[in-house]
């Protein structure tokens, strides 16, 4: 007996004992057979459309009528009726050619046994031996019972695979647009005599699984060669196959059963294995074979037609290593679609997403999703990244439609506060409380009326959107029903749906959409819900993903960009020429007219120490990101040795730290829109510049792990002191200084490096007038720090001139000024504050008095 038969017998004995029956009757056994999880009898009844709950209820009634024996303790034994069924089951097993007596043999024996009690029950539920035999043949196929666990080998594909053709017939698969060449190639390989196993190879997100789904859709539409019409495409679920295989050999058993079912279908079933590389090594334990080895013989003989899908990296890593497995598959390369093709693919999918989110998606949104994702999301592939953008933008609007609008929410919160206040004031007895109560009542009445109006408008708009969503879903269902009726040859039904219900529903939808558009036009000012996804919604999602501002510029931002130099001048004094060059680069990028294949700007800032080179970079970061720390700052003095280059892009394979990635590449991967500062660039080893050539020219760099990092949205600034002696020489004219600096640069850097820089910016040495401006900037910072302590401070002109004169040093620039402010102003001031002479609320007046400052 099989395991399930033994379990059923034991359960039947326990049931008889519970019911105090004198012996185990066939009804007890039948009851357990019908209730058996993963058993075969429930599957037979399913196929015969027998309502199991009703069947069990009738059985229970029969069992309850059996005579009962009290006193207990007696041993349970099989009744003569059951023994007769045992013998019949043995005969049944021999007839089927099985080595074990299985549960279905008992069931067939009961049907054929001529037991009057059971016959009545079967007749009432229209269960006949012939029908049961047909159902059983369907379930078992050509399998024989050769071990004690046959149930795991019946209908294994239903357990461990998804029927893609069935899903396609029900309209549950997304339409597949384009990709005709690849599908034709797959069909070509499938039609070979041997080794008819295509494997789809491509980058993640280019649509490999979609090609398999496209083939399923074509099989259903009969848009395939004759040898594929009516075939089933099943997607194997490796996870389900491995999960729960507790004993050694159980996984192999399951896989053998899958292979057997596919091969015995005589080519009717094509297997699709997504993530094909999971086959190699799957289920491998010591002494066991892995899945790949079990599949090889069937694949080579052409008995098992299989479509695989995997990425380039995994194919190389797992499948190419096993040459015997590799030669059984024929590769079909799936390239990333072009921008135009991706737009076509999105247009094909648009309807599915509109139905799901209940929102219209404009064509402009589809185009901008593809173009923006192609330009700004460089580490992923089309069409997947563009589909994700559209999906998220539509999801955002869909959520807004379904949740209470902000205006309504705000009013309801106000109402809540007023009601709480009203309850508190009711307890007060004085006049002012009564007056306030009257005011609150009036406010509550007004807000209630306003809320009522807004809620009605929201419900009305929401109702319109929901109505359109429901109609679209209905139309989708009707189209599936039409296709099904046409396939089944029910032309009457197809005509009724196609020329009756479908046009009617489409007409309704058109009318609803027209009304909705009219309403949107007439009340565009007061409209609460937005019901279509536009390009600006997509741009907003891109900005959230990448941090790159691609959304439409607001008035305030365009004004800010036009006057960018003025904001930078508040921090950087005396270097107007340098600020204009940087501002122009940022404006070009934001207007989207700069070269999309290069960084926003690459500059080299030259000049003596302390003239504001690094300060300009910080000011730029604060202007762009409101945070001066948003600079990817790399001190090139740390890269003096040749081997330090690997710290920038990450260690090569085989070295410690390979997994970590490089300092420069990782920070730009995380923040693609940033200011990169390479400080003191002349201190680095010359080999470092070889790496920078790629960044300066193509805006890209490949890190130690072979990933391409995109620098197209960065501003790259290098600072250097090369030629600062010439800049400081008072006897040289501007042109002579520039000549001397260029000469020094040519000596220090290679021509191919200098030639790739957008602009070499010379910072002038600072004069006394500029130092005076810097004093004001620094004193503003001091005042800011004191304001936090509630202390005011002001300076007269003499004090400013005194600090400027004392802090001026043409060689060291503005840095000595900070030290002077520290010693002359901050040190004595700190003593005054600590001693308690200066307290919160005071204002300090600072004046110059000869050689010191007085407070």
Swiss-Prot record:
<keyword id="KW-0175">Coiled coil</keyword>
<comment type="similarity">
    <text>Belongs to the ClpA/ClpB family.</text>
</comment>
<dbReference type="InterPro" id="IPR001270">
    <property type="entry name" value="ClpA/B"/>
</dbReference>
<feature type="region of interest" description="Disordered">
    <location>
        <begin position="513"/>
        <end position="532"/>
    </location>
</feature>
<feature type="region of interest" description="Disordered">
    <location>
        <begin position="1"/>
        <end position="22"/>
    </location>
</feature>
<dbReference type="GO" id="GO:0042026">
    <property type="term" value="P:protein refolding"/>
</dbReference>
<feature type="region of interest" description="NBD2">
    <location>
        <begin position="557"/>
        <end position="765"/>
    </location>
</feature>
<feature type="region of interest" description="Linker">
    <location>
        <begin position="337"/>
        <end position="547"/>
    </location>
</feature>
<feature type="binding site">
    <location>
        <begin position="607"/>
        <end position="614"/>
    </location>
    <ligand>
        <name>ATP 2</name>
    </ligand>
</feature>
<feature type="region of interest" description="Repeat 1">
    <location>
        <begin position="1"/>
        <end position="66"/>
    </location>
</feature>
<dbReference type="InterPro" id="IPR027417">
    <property type="entry name" value="P-loop_NTPase"/>
</dbReference>
<dbReference type="GO" id="GO:0016887">
    <property type="term" value="F:ATP hydrolysis activity"/>
</dbReference>
<dbReference type="GO" id="GO:0005524">
    <property type="term" value="F:ATP binding"/>
</dbReference>
<dbReference type="InterPro" id="IPR003959">
    <property type="entry name" value="ATPase_AAA_core"/>
</dbReference>
<feature type="region of interest" description="NBD1">
    <location>
        <begin position="155"/>
        <end position="336"/>
    </location>
</feature>
<dbReference type="InterPro" id="IPR004176">
    <property type="entry name" value="Clp_R_dom"/>
</dbReference>
<comment type="function">
    <text>Part of a stress-induced multi-chaperone system, it is involved in the recovery of the cell from heat-induced damage, in cooperation with DnaK, DnaJ and GrpE. Acts before DnaK, in the processing of protein aggregates. Protein binding stimulates the ATPase activity; ATP hydrolysis unfolds the denatured protein aggregates, which probably helps expose new hydrophobic binding sites on the surface of ClpB-bound aggregates, contributing to the solubilization and refolding of denatured protein aggregates by DnaK.</text>
</comment>
<keyword id="KW-0143">Chaperone</keyword>
<keyword id="KW-0067">ATP-binding</keyword>
<feature type="region of interest" description="Repeat 2">
    <location>
        <begin position="78"/>
        <end position="142"/>
    </location>
</feature>
<dbReference type="InterPro" id="IPR017730">
    <property type="entry name" value="Chaperonin_ClpB"/>
</dbReference>
<feature type="region of interest" description="C-terminal">
    <location>
        <begin position="766"/>
        <end position="855"/>
    </location>
</feature>
<dbReference type="InterPro" id="IPR028299">
    <property type="entry name" value="ClpA/B_CS2"/>
</dbReference>
<dbReference type="Pfam" id="PF02861">
    <property type="entry name" value="Clp_N"/>
</dbReference>
<feature type="coiled-coil region">
    <location>
        <begin position="387"/>
        <end position="521"/>
    </location>
</feature>
<protein>
    <recommendedName>
        <fullName>Chaperone protein ClpB</fullName>
    </recommendedName>
</protein>
<dbReference type="InterPro" id="IPR041546">
    <property type="entry name" value="ClpA/ClpB_AAA_lid"/>
</dbReference>
<comment type="subunit">
    <text>Homohexamer. The oligomerization is ATP-dependent.</text>
</comment>
<keyword id="KW-0346">Stress response</keyword>
<dbReference type="Pfam" id="PF10431">
    <property type="entry name" value="ClpB_D2-small"/>
</dbReference>
<keyword id="KW-0963">Cytoplasm</keyword>
<dbReference type="InterPro" id="IPR050130">
    <property type="entry name" value="ClpA_ClpB"/>
</dbReference>
<keyword id="KW-0547">Nucleotide-binding</keyword>
<dbReference type="InterPro" id="IPR003593">
    <property type="entry name" value="AAA+_ATPase"/>
</dbReference>
<dbReference type="GO" id="GO:0034605">
    <property type="term" value="P:cellular response to heat"/>
</dbReference>
<feature type="binding site">
    <location>
        <begin position="202"/>
        <end position="209"/>
    </location>
    <ligand>
        <name>ATP 1</name>
    </ligand>
</feature>
<dbReference type="Pfam" id="PF17871">
    <property type="entry name" value="AAA_lid_9"/>
</dbReference>
<dbReference type="InterPro" id="IPR036628">
    <property type="entry name" value="Clp_N_dom_sf"/>
</dbReference>
<dbReference type="InterPro" id="IPR019489">
    <property type="entry name" value="Clp_ATPase_C"/>
</dbReference>
<dbReference type="Pfam" id="PF00004">
    <property type="entry name" value="AAA"/>
</dbReference>
<dbReference type="GO" id="GO:0005737">
    <property type="term" value="C:cytoplasm"/>
</dbReference>
<feature type="domain" description="Clp R">
    <location>
        <begin position="1"/>
        <end position="142"/>
    </location>
</feature>
């Amino acid at each position: 007996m099989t395991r399930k038969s033994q379990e059923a017998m034991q359960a039947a004995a326990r049931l008889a004992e519970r019911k105090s029956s004198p012996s185990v009757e066939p009804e007890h056994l039948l009851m357990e057979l019908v209730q058996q999880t993963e058993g075969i009898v429930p599957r037979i009844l399913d196929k015969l459309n027998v309502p199991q709950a009703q069947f069990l209820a009738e059985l229970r009634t029969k069992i309850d009528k059996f005579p009962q024996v009290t006193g207990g303790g007696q041993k349970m034994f099989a009744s003569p009726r059951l023994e007769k069924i045992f013998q019949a089951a043995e005969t049944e097993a021999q007839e089927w050619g099985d080595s074990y007596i299985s549960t279905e043999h008992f069931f067939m024996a009961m049907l054929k046994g001529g037991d009057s009690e059971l016959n009545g029950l079967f007749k009432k539920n229209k269960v006949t031996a012939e029908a049961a035999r047909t159902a059983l043949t369907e379930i078992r196929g050509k399998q024989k019972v050769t071990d004690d666990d046959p149930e795991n080998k019946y209908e294994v594909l239903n357990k461990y695979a998804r029927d893609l053709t069935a899903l396609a017939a029900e309209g549950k698969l997304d339409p597949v647009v384009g990709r005709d060449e690849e599908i034709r190639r797959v069909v070509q390989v499938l039609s070979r005599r041997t080794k008819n196993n295509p494997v789809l190879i491509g980058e993640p997100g280019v649509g490999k699984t979609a090609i398999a789904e496209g083939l399923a859709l074509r099989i259903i539409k009969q848009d395939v060669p004759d040898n594929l019409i009516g075939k089933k495409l099943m997607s194997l679920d490796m996870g389900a196959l491995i999960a729960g295989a507790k004993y050694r050999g159980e996984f192999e058993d399951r896989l053998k059963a899958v292979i057997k079912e596919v091969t015995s279908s005589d080519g009717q079933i094509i297997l699709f294995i997504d993530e094909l590389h999971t086959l190699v090594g799957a289920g491998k334990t010591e002494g066991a074979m892995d899945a790949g080895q079990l599949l090889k013989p069937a694949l080579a003989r052409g008995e098992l037609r299989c479509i695989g899908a995997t990425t380039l990296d995994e194919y190389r890593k797992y499948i190419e290593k096993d040459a015997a497995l590799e030669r059984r598959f024929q590769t079909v390369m799936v390239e990333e679609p072009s921008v135009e093709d991706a737009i076509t693919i999105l247009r094909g999918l648009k309807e599915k997403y509109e139905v799901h989110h209940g929102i219209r998606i404009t064509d402009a949104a589809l185009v901008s999703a593809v173009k923006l994702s192609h330009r700004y999301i460089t580490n992923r592939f089309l069409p997947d990244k563009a589909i994700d953008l559209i999906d998220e933008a539509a999801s955002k609007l869909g959520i807004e439609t379904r949740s209470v609008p902000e205006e309504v929410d705000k009013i309801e919160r106000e109402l809540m506060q007023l009601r709480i206040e009203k309850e508190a004031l009711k307890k007060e007895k004085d006049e002012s409380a009564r007056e306030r109560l009257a005011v609150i009542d009036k406010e509550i009445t007004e807000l209630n009326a306003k809320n009522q109006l807004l809620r009605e408008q929201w419900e009305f708009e929401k109702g319109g959107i929901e109505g359109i969503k429901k109609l679209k879903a209905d139309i989708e269902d009707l189209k599936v029903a039409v296709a099904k009726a046409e396939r089944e040859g029910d032309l009457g039904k197809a005509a009724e749906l196609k020329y009756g219900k479908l046009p009617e529903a489409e007409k309704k939808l058109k009318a609803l959409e027209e009304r909705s558009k009219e309403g949107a036009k007439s009340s565009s000012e007061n409209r609460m819900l937005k019901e279509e996804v536009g390009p600006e919604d997509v741009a907003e999602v891109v900005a959230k993903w990448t941090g790159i501002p691609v959304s439409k510029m607001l008035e305030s931002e365009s004004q800010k960009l036009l006057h960018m130099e003025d904001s930078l001048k508040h921090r950087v004094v005396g270097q107007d020429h340098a600020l204009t060059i940087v501002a122009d680069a940022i404006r070009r990028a934001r207007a989207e007219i700069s070269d999309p294949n290069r960084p926003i700007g690459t500059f080299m800032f030259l000049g003596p120490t302390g003239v504001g080179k690094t300060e300009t970079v910080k000011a730029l970061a604060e202007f762009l990101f409101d945070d001066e720390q948003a600079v990817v700052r790399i001190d090139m003095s740390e890269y003096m040795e040749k081997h330090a280059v690997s710290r920038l892009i990450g260690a090569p394979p085989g070295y410690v730290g390979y997994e970590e990635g490089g300092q420069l590449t990782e920070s730009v991967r995380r923040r693609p829109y940033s200011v990169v500062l390479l400080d003191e660039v002349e201190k680095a080893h010359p080999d470092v510049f070889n790496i920078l050539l790629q960044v300066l020219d193509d805006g890209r760099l490949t890190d130690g792990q072979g990933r391409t990092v995109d620098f197209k949205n960065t501003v790259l600034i290098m600072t250097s002191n090369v030629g600062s002696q010439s800049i400081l020489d008072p006897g040289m004219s501007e042109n002579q200084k520039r000549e001397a600096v260029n000469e020094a640069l040519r000596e220090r850097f290679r021509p191919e490096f200098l030639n790739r820089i957008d602009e070499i910016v010379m910072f002038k040495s600072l004069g006394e007038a500029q130092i005076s401006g810097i004093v004001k900037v620094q004193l503003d910072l001091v005042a800011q720090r004191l304001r936090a302590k509630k202390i005011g401070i002001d300076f007269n002109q003499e004090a400013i001139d005194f600090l400027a004169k004392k802090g001026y040093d043409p060689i060291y620039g503005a840095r000595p000024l900070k030290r002077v402010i520290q010693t002359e102003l901050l040190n004595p001031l700190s003593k005054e504050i600590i001693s308690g002479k200066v307290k919160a609320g005071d204002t300090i007046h600072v004046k110059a008095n000869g050689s010191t400052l007085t407070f």
